[in-house]
A protein has these predicted regions:
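Acidic, polar-rich low-complexity tracts and alpha-helical solenoid repeat scaffolds
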Residues: 6, 14-161
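Bacterial N-terminal signal peptides that target proteins for export
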Residues: 1-7
């Protein structure tokens, strides 16, 4: 075998060993393991690889959504979470994560940032666009009691007692 042929046979094996050819599914699983182990930055990097390298894969919108969730839940970086949820809506407009992203943006604006105007905008978009969605009633509830204290919401009064 010629040296050139040998190199062409070895290079893909070396690259695969380095993780350059990992599937989107494997990267996603690895990201979940990293996140659950508290390595959120490593998880974000793996998820970003899915979004960048496997754009058309079914895991790409899930990866983008999980990036947003990590910023919201793990890092409590609400502004960045809102931006990442926007990427779900803009880059994967037909994915099932879009309504959840819109809901989460409204939720963050209302409950974390106390920006009730933006919350109302996002929740109203949800109501118009997704009248049959499983979160529809939750959005109606959020809109109805937007800006109110828990003690002022009859259905939740028992929580503060």
């Amino acid at each position: 075998m010629k040296t050139k042929d040998l190199l062409f046979a070895i290079i893909p094996l070396v690259m695969a060993g380095c993780g350059l050819f990992k599937s989107a599914d494997n990267l996603y699983k690895e990201a979940e393991i990293k996140r659950n182990g508290g390595e959120v930055q490593a998880a974000l990097e793996l998820l970003q690889r899915i979004v960048n390298q496997h754009t058309d894969h079914k895991k790409a919108p899930e990866a983008q959504y999980l990036i947003a969730e990590i910023y919201y839940r793990d890092m409590r970086d609400y502004s960045e979470a809102i931006k990442q949820y926007d990427k779900v809506k803009n880059n994967f407009p037909d994915s099932k994560q879009v309504p959840f992203s819109l809901f989460m943006q409204g939720f963050i604006f209302a409950n974390m940032l106390a920006d009730f105007k933006q919350a109302e905008i996002h929740y109203s978009k949800f109501i118009k666009k997704y009248p049959d969605h499983e979160l529809y009633q939750s959005v109606e509830f959020e809109l109805k009691y937007l800006g109110k204290e828990i003690k002022d919401i009859p259905a939740l009064k028992h929580i503060t007692s």
